[in-house]
Amino acid sequence: MISFPRILFPVDLSEQCRAAAPFVKALATCFHSDVTLLHVVEVPPAWYGASGEAAFGAWVDMPELVEARRKELAAFRADTLGEVSVQPCIQSGDPAAIIARVARQKQVGLIMMPTHGYGPFRGLLMGSVTAKVLHDAECPVWTATHPADMVVPPEQEWRQILCAIGAEPAKDIPLLHWAAQFASEQRACLRLVHAVPGFDEGQFNCQEDPLRDFVFNVARERIAKLQEQAGTSLNVTVEAGRTGHVVRELAIRQLADLVVIGRGVIQKPLGRLRSNAYAIVRDAPCPVVSV
């Protein structure tokens, strides 16, 4: 059974984090989870040197700053998480590294965070902290790009779930197992989605184009074989286009509550986060769980 006895909710006290809090509260209530509410006092990289944080501490009263943030964190908790079991935690240093470390130390089952807050990276489509956490985290990571615009399902009931696959057995079979088990336990409808790479949406102008038929048939055959190996028999949507766009449009049409994607081990600079995952996380109209 998939469960999340411990959830890590890193917050920078921004409006994005405040908008994500109802999802954390609903999911923690559903799974009876303990929530670690983590705030990292970020030490500017320019102050790191031979003396570490000492240089920064010489200019900033660190205990006073931490105490001020502790009060802000307590107010954030009271305003957003209600009766959920919460353990506040304040640390200083590099946010992404600390989030990954705390997740390992506390053996959390899920990290929940918006894709960016109000920081120096607010102009980017995805904040650097979220990108690093997606890259390094060993547990599933829940993200939402615009949580304020999303509807929290009542009692966190998932009705429609999409699972984006690439039809690569080594990476997708574990992903299929996780998504199928989660959907079954939550009594949700699960649909697979696969984007045909290398083609734009307008490239197939004729529905009977032989190239279109060939490419789509190959994709469907690979997915059928994948499902046979995984022991699943799920409905599949195969469409041409950019992966992020295909997943987004289908999620809108299906009124999806959740998108599940994988972060398979690949020999590329992206490490655990496979290609196209950034686009899905960035563009999805609903929360995304990266496993």
Q: For the regions a protein language model found, what residue spans apply to each?
A:
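Histidine-anchored nucleotide/phosphate-binding helix
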Residues: 21-28, 175-183
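General small-molecule cofactor/ligand-binding pocket signal
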Residues: 36-38, 87-91, 142, 191-193, ...
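Short, well-ordered secondary-structure micro-motifs
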Residues: 48-49, 124, 153-154, 173-174, ...
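Glycine-rich, Arg-bearing micro-motifs that act as flexible, cationic patches
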Residues: 110-135, 258-283
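Structural beta-alpha unit
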Residues: 1-2, 42, 71, 75-111, ...
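Acidic, proline/glycine-rich short linear motifs
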Residues: 39-71, 193-221
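Residues at the starts of beta-strands that form the adenosine-phosphate
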Residues: 6, 32-36, 85, 159-160, ...
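Intrinsically disordered or low-complexity boundary/linker segments at protein termini
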Residues: 1-19, 47, 110-115, 132-177, ...
